[in-house]
């Protein structure tokens, strides 16, 4: 048996209204995120497949192999060298989220091996059977990262490639990499499968224009998701405080 404590009816109603308002706000945020993600997916398909051309661009696109425009490299096994407060961030399998962005928290090491430089692209080379992360890419923002095993590195060979465009195109075509995964309980990507991936490549100025549009949508979606996480935490804390009478709803 346990005792149930509850406020007077008017305070019950006030608490319910506050939490219901938060629920409605979170629901609307979810709907907005889904809408923005749908817009981004549709626009990515149209822009990256040439179904829609941006105004002022009409030059032909060139079909290229990923291996011809990028140098591919593998990471090393550094799990035994991980330290709590290392100076360098270790790029591992769990360093990239499902949206193809680097996570804020990752393991660290105390050495730099020149495996990664600013503007390199890192790719997930191994995943469990569903393969949802296989081939996902993110861009390295600075020179304080080290590449771990089962992660790949793409480094552009010339200045005619925009790294943001390349990352967007690879992530929009992740189905190719999932199909190329080899194995049963764990899928792995081969160097050949990665280098043979073909990309329709527009002139550099069009790459930049496309990347700017889609990256702006990515930033907007990421901002909305961050706001959603913040309000989820607010609701959780407020729910606890109101239901435990730590915070009382006072009548004005």
Predicted feature locations:
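Non-catalytic DNA-recognition/assembly elements of restriction-modification systems
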Residues: 9, 54-76, 98, 196, ...
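Sequence-specific dsDNA recognition surfaces
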Residues: 67-79, 92-121
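A short glycine-rich beta-alpha junction/loop motif
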Residues: 1-10, 145-152, 182-205
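Generic structural signal for buried aliphatic residues
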Residues: 19, 121-123, 214
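A short beta-sheet element
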Residues: 92-94, 110-171
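Short amphipathic coiled-coil heptad-repeat segments
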Residues: 14, 21-64, 223-252
């Amino acid at each position: 048996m346990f005792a149930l404590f509850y406020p007077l009816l008017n305070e019950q109603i006030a608490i319910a209204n506050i939490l219901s308002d938060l629920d409605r706000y979170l629901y609307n945020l979810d709907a907005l995120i889904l809408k923005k993600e749908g817009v981004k997916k549709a626009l990515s398909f149209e822009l990256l497949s040439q179904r829609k051309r941006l105004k002022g661009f009409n030059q032909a696109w060139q079909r290229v192999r990923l291996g011809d425009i990028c140098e591919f490299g593998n990471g090393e096994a550094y799990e035994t060298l991980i330290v709590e407060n290392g100076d360098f961030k270790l790029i591992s399998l769990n360093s990239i989220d499902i949206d193809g962005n680097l996570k804020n928290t990752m393991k660290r090491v105390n050495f730099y091996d020149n495996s990664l430089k600013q503007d390199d692209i890192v790719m997930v080379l191994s995943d469990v059977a569903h393969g949802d992360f296989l081939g996902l890419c993110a861009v390295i923002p600075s020179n304080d990262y080290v590449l771990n095993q089962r992660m790949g590195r793409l480094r552009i060979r010339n200045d005619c490639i925009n790294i943001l465009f390349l990352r967007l195109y690879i992530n929009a075509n992740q189905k190719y990499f999932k199909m190329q995964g080899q194995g049963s309980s764990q899928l792995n990507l081969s160097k050949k499968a990665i280098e043979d991936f073909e990309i329709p490549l527009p002139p550099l100025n069009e790459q930049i224009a496309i990347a700017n549009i889609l990256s702006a949508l990515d930033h907007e979606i990421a901002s909305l998701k961050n706001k959603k996480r913040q309000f989820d935490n607010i609701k959780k804390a407020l729910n606890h405080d109101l239901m435990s009478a730590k915070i009382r709803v006072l009548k004005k």
